[in-house]
From Swiss-Prot:
Principal place of residence: cytoplasm
Positions marked as site (Important for tRNA non-discrimination): H30, G81
Keyword Cell wall biogenesis/degradation annotated: no
Its EC number(s): 6.1.1.23
Spans traversing the lipid bilayer: none
Name of this protein: Aspartate--tRNA(Asp/Asn) ligase
Record-listed L-aspartate binding positions: E172, R218, H450, R491
Biological process terms in GO annotation: aspartyl-tRNA aminoacylation
Role noted for this protein: Aspartyl-tRNA synthetase with relaxed tRNA specificity since it is able to aspartylate not only its cognate tRNA(Asp) but also tRNA(Asn). Reaction proceeds in two steps: L-aspartate is first activated by ATP to form Asp-AMP and then transferred to the acceptor end of tRNA(Asp/Asn).
Species annotation: Acidithiobacillus ferrooxidans (strain ATCC 23270 / DSM 14882 / CIP 104768 / NCIMB 8455) (Ferrobacillus ferrooxidans (strain ATCC 23270))
Family annotation (InterPro entries): Aa-tRNA-synt_II, aa-tRNA-synth_II, aa-tRNA-synth_II/BPL/LPL, Asp-tRNA-ligase_1, Asp-tRNA-ligase_1_N, Asp/Asn-tRNA-synth_IIb, AspRS_core, GAD-like_sf
Gene name linked to the record: aspS
Enzyme class: ligase
UniProt catalytic activity: tRNA(Asx) + L-aspartate + ATP = L-aspartyl-tRNA(Asx) + AMP + diphosphate
Classification lineage: Bacteria, Pseudomonadati, Pseudomonadota, Acidithiobacillia, Acidithiobacillales
Cytoplasm recorded as keyword: yes
């Protein structure tokens, strides 16, 4: 139906007859001559319909925005002075000899050339939103990423293997999406949160090197960087250690950025332990473009009279720290109050601060409600440790280490963004030596920091049961500009070690056998040492194209309420379907009457 895409139209084709297909982006009637900007996936071309081409002119006169057209004509140079330097085809135009209206369009609910469009409207009419060049660019960039990744891993000897989408429910840290079985009433499949167990079984099977670009599903509360279904670049290999896994993944990411953006990332990527990241930045995914760091003050505050600081410093897992903001003394009280409210989101019960107006005037050079509660010697040491200078402000956190880290760590990011402190464009970093376990105060038990199949570091094997809080994992995350883009670990390949980890998590032998019996059985048959990692494709593409959320790089995303505005999913189903599945709805569930 066509001879060229719009981006294939250029001066070298002047005088030739070409046929284009696409959508009418804009129609203009200039004194009897009609101009149409024809758009396809690749670009725009200006169509000119002259009155002497009667049929073509009549069709152009009838044409409206987003009509689907086939246009045949002779390419010619635009008249001098009418060229458009902002279009690749801006020096030429197509003189229409024939215009065929392939389909008509109702007026669209929003102008496709506008940028400020309500997201709900965009998601409801996603098929129109995707016509916009910006969205087409993002989907093409996503394709470019997956094509590069497949080529890299293929060349590295990895084999693409699909794993099941219908599997059994296993605890992996988030709620499963359950699928009831019609043939086995009362039983359920689960949609996989990751291919974790199956890729380990592929290593037991001797596949040696596996990868997959696959959908994963998690029924969890959503944020800007989460979706109930998301895509993962999943990688696993046998006979590897941490260095080998990172040594495979790092060149892939470095090559990807060079291929897609023409950017040279550092070689090698810097590394940082989890402990160091939390101590310096308060988070395990630090944005290293941000020059701000936390300063440790816990030891200083154990003997002060200021109760808020002293009690936090004396508690077993307490912390007192400060965040120095250069030039922050200019912040208004309203801005400080806004930051106080921001840290409250993370559990902080207040945000103490000191403005440093002058360093050579002792306490007189400091402005703060808390200065009078702290000895001059302590204040002097705070200024020394933090490297404070005149014109700075110090923000303080005093509570459990968890609350202080989350509050000041996130405040660090917020302040840097507000004040334009970010330096550089791309700053990757590997975070290593994660704790094996986190303590869940609500459930009063240890939980896996990553997942229960992560191997502990060798020196902690014997003390897992007695001292789980100090055990470190053979785990690693890759962080880019404050975003965790990938993570993985060396896996447990010996049943005795797996049983120790289950025991530390409070998973007894019977429960382990019930939930993971197939994995434990596989470990009997010569499982090789193995490990891997996974990258979040959606988040990676979001960063590469500068989008604000991963919803902007997924063709048909869900909302933050896990719904689809386009299809209105999730939806209700017929009573007959529920009866076949042996499901009865509670009264009031789903907005209807439960089936009999």
């Amino acid at each position: 139906m066509r001879t060229h895409y719009c981006n294939g139209i250029h001066e070298g084709l002047i005088g030739q007859t070409v046929t284009l297909c696409g959508w009418a982006q804009r129609r203009r009637d200039h004194g009897g001559v009609i101009f149409i900007d024809l758009r396809d996936r690749e670009g725009l071309v200006q169509i000119v319909a002259d009155p002497d081409q009667v049929d073509a002119f009549a069709a152009a006169n009838e044409c409206r925005s987003e009509f689907v057209l086939q246009v045949e004509g002779v390419l010619r140079a635009r008249p001098a002075g009418t060229e458009n330097p902002h279009m690749p085809s801006g020096k030429v135009e197509l003189a229409a000899a024939r215009i065929r209206i392939l389909n008509r369009s109702e007026p669209v609910p929003f102008p496709l050339d506008e940028e400020d469009i309500a997201e709900n409207l965009r998601l409801k009419y996603r098929y129109l939103d995707l016509r916009r060049p910006e969205m087409l660019h993002r989907l093409r960039l996503r394709h470019q990423v997956t094509r590069f990744v497949r080529g890299y891993l293929d060349n590295a000897g990895f084999i693409d293997v699909e794993t099941p989408v219908l599997t059994r429910s296993t605890p992996e840290g988030a709620r499963d999406y359950l699928v009831p079985s019609r043939t086995q009433p009362g039983h359920f499949f689960a949609l996989p949160q990751s291919p974790q167990l199956f890729k380990q079984l592929l290593m037991v099977a001797g596949l040696d090197r596996y990868y997959q670009i696959t959908k994963c599903f998690r029924d969890e509360d959503l944020r800007a960087d989460r979706q109930p279904e998301f895509t993962q670049i999943d990688i696993e290999a046998s006979f590897v250690d941490e260095e080998a896994v990172m040594g495979t993944a790092e060149p892939m990411i470095r090559g990807l950025f060079a291929e897609v953006l023409g950017v040279q990332l550092p070689d090698p990527f810097p590394r940082m332990t989890y402990r160091d990241a939390m101590h310096r930045f308060g988070v395990d995914r630090p944005d290293l473009r941000n020059p701000l760091e936390l300063t440790e003050l816990t030891d200083l505050m154990r003997a002060v009279d200021f109760k808020v600081f002293r009690e936090a410093a004396e508690r077993p897992h307490g912390r007192v720290a400060c965040l120095r903001v250069p030039g922050g003394a200019q912040l208004s009280r309203a801005q400080i109050d806004a930051y106080t409210q921001f840290t409250a989101i993370y559990g902080a019960r207040g945000l103490a601060w000191i403005k440093v107006n002058a360093l050579d005037q002792g306490n007189e050079g400091l402005q703060s409600p808390i200065v009078k509660f702290l000895p001059e010697m302590v204040l002097s040491e705070i200024l020394r440790r933090s490297g404070a200078a005149a014109g700075d402000i110090l923000f303080f956190g005093a509570d459990t280490a968890k609350i202080v880290n989350e509050a000041l760590g996130n405040l660090r990011n917020r302040v840097a963004a507000d004040l334009g402190l970010l330096e550089g464009e791309w700053c990757p970093v590997w975070i290593t030596d994660f704790p094996m376990f986190d303590y869940d105060d609500k459930e009063d038990r240890w939980t896996s920091t990553h997942h229960p199949f992560t191997a502990p570091q060798t020196e902690h094997l014997e003390t897992l049961g007695q001292d789980p809080g100090n055990a470190l994992a053979r785990a690693y995350d890759l962080v880019l500009n404050g975003n965790e883009i990938g993570g993985g670990s060396i896996r447990i390949h010996q049943e005795a070690v797996q049983e120790k980890v289950f025991a530390a998590l409070g998973i007894g032998a019977e429960e382990a056998r019930d939930k993971f019996g197939f994995l434990l059985d596989a470990l009997h048959y010569g499982a090789p040492p193995h490990g891997g990692l996974a990258f979040g494709l959606d988040r990676l593409v979001m960063l590469l194209c500068g989008a604000e959320t991963i919803r902007d790089v997924i063709a048909f995303p869900k909302t933050q309420k896990a719904g689809c505005l386009l299809t209105e999913a999730p939806g209700t189903v017929a009573d007959k379907q529920l009866q076949e599945l042996g499901i009865r709805l509670r009264p009031g569930v789903g907005g209807g009457v439960p089936n009999p």
